[in-house]
Design a protein with these regions (language model features):
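Conserved interdomain hinge at the start of the Helicase C-terminal
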Residues: 102-106
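Short acidic/histidine-rich active-site segments
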Residues: 120-127
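Active-site clefts of carbohydrate-active enzymes
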Residues: 74-99, 131-133
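Hydrophobic/aromatic residues located in beta-strands of well-ordered beta-sheets
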Residues: 24, 119-120
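Active-site flanking residues adjacent to catalytic metal/cofactor-binding acidic residues
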Residues: 26, 85, 125
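Carbohydrate-binding surface patches
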Residues: 175-180
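Active-site-proximal helices and loops of the catalytic beta/alpha 8
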Residues: 2-80, 110-113, 128-164, 168-169
Length: 180
């Protein structure tokens, strides 16, 4: 992170004095960001692992290793913004369909089901819109009708809403691996 944590700690203190329930999200992943500053941070390592697994550059057990390592380094209440696409990656690296291919739904489900997850649904994903947006130019989303992908997202959101174990942070269940 380019801005020292001391700045963010002081800023968070001042901001929360005005609005105690303020939620602060860091577009970075360093573990120290949760030290009296941010409530959530981007899960960049997980994002890159999901892409690598989908492209068969590494084994899926690397995701499990990430989860165990992350649990050791961040508070139980901390959240990770988990995503298969965002404004940067969609523009520069291609849509989730290009990067994840046939694994797009599995990886999307992971962002909703993993512990400490704060799932991000990026522009058009709820319609299955396969398009890389221009980063610096106007590139509007066309009108989209609900479809099979919309229903997939609705089901994930409903599952997350209806299952207390899938709640974020300390309100949710624990990550327990069942080995077979």
């Amino acid at each position: 992170m380019l801005v020292p944590i001391e700045f963010w700690q002081e800023a968070a203190r001042w901001l929360r004095a005005v609005k105690p329930d303020l939620f602060l999200l860091a577009e970075a992943e360093e573990d120290y960001l949760f030290d009296r500053a941010f409530d959530a941070s981007y899960a960049w390592r997980l994002y890159h692992l999901m892409n690598d697994v989908a492209q068969q550059k590494c084994r899926v057990d690397r995701i499990r290793e990430y989860l165990y390592a992350d649990r050791k380094h961040v508070p139980a209440w901390a959240l990770r913004l988990m995503f298969t696409s965002n404004h940067d990656e969609n523009s520069w690296s291609g849509s989730e369909f290009v990067r994840l291919g046939p694994a797009v739904r599995v990886m999307t489900a992971l962002t909703f089901l993993l512990p400490q997850s704060l799932p991000l649904v990026y522009t058009g994903q709820e319609f299955g819109y396969d398009h890389s947006f221009a980063f610096f130019d106007r590139d509007p989303l066309p009108a989209c009708e609900p479809n099979e992908t919309t229903e997939f997202y609705r089901r994930l959101i409903a599952l997350r809403h209806d299952a207390p174990a899938l709640a974020s942070g300390e309100r949710g269940g624990s990550f327990v691996e069942i080995r077979n």
